């Protein structure tokens, strides 16, 4: 099957499946999710074998440590994916929820009810877990999904899609509800970007290059999941022990993800007392530090930070550090270089915290906590399909509610308009 025919055929199947999914009951959708979870565990050996092929190819291509980490599947990650599907099954079904109802003077009753978006296209890079998370969320919310993963995870995505789609269909979901574009040909992406006849929305997940390509070239509506150039600002009135714990977690707990911190801003009043011990702890964890001139005066072994560093999402054990002279300077830096993803302040001053919350324009703004919590699971949404950095139609971690739209339902008793 050539690429154009594959996109057309799977698009038609998805459109047909979406009509059935929209009316599929909650219990039937949950049964399918639980069947998918069981299938992942039962087919673990085949999934890991497919992933091993991708890992070998990735190492031969010289993929970075961060990319290889995102690509890797192991028993724990498969268990986590299965657990995520079970958690999703336990969540309330947003579809059919009447969010408001009112009566007009003429007696008309008007309600606003949640409904699926329809067919969702997901274009993503080397993260096989996205295959399962996206499929599960779309099924939960009555949406059909067409997946197009990165070539680095080709075999993993094939194996995962085969396992979960068969399980979902056997449990009562329509055929075509979960489909993967099974080619590494980049033309498939170009075709999906213009597949208005089949797709209701496209969601890209990946690096800046992929997201920019989708946003600039798609004729299908796009929900932009942005790059995470995230900051932590350590205020003059911060608890420095707390600040060190937060910084180390935000940078090193999992550096290859979009909610990891990339730049640390430190108020000049605490820089001399805070940075030496922090730098030693970061060095012990293998972090490369790139600092401004004032940072390097305190941490002599730090590399020189350039203008490019302030704007870079490293996705690696690299941290840029800048000493600032005020909250205003920190806010200005975040405004200039931030990507409206996740930003944090560490402070004991309530008014300073309130000002930071009010003035930082980001999907998630933290006081005294790590940026690593910007995540659908951590927010209690179950799985997430991505973290939106735009303001329409969704913002922040996109859980089930964010994969619905609404329609109005109107009950009358013979009213006609005069």
Swiss-Prot record:
It catalyses: L-glutamate 5-semialdehyde + phosphate + NADP(+) = L-glutamyl 5-phosphate + NADPH + H(+). It is found in: Cytoplasm. Its main location: cytoplasm. SUPFAM superfamilies: ALDH-like. One of its GO terms (biological process) is L-proline biosynthetic process. Keywords: Amino-acid biosynthesis, Cytoplasm, NADP, Oxidoreductase, Proline biosynthesis. InterPro entries: Ald_DH/histidinol_DH, Ald_DH_C, Ald_DH_N, Aldehyde_DH_dom, G-glutamylP_reductase_CS, Glu-5-SA_DH, GPR_dom. Its EC number is 1.2.1.41. Pathway: Amino-acid biosynthesis; L-proline biosynthesis; L-glutamate 5-semialdehyde from L-glutamate: step 2/2. Transmembrane segments: none annotated. GO terms for cellular component: cytoplasm. One of its GO terms (molecular function) is NADP binding. It comes from the Bacteria. Catalyzes the NADPH-dependent reduction of L-glutamate 5-phosphate into L-glutamate 5-semialdehyde and phosphate. The product spontaneously undergoes cyclization to form 1-pyrroline-5-carboxylate. PANTHER family: DELTA-1-PYRROLINE-5-CARBOXYLATE SYNTHASE, GLUTAMATE SEMIALDEHYDE DEHYDROGENASE. Belongs to the gamma-glutamyl phosphate reductase family. HAMAP family: ProA (MF_00412). This is Gamma-glutamyl phosphate reductase. It comes from Moorella thermoacetica (strain ATCC 39073 / JCM 9320). The gene is proA.
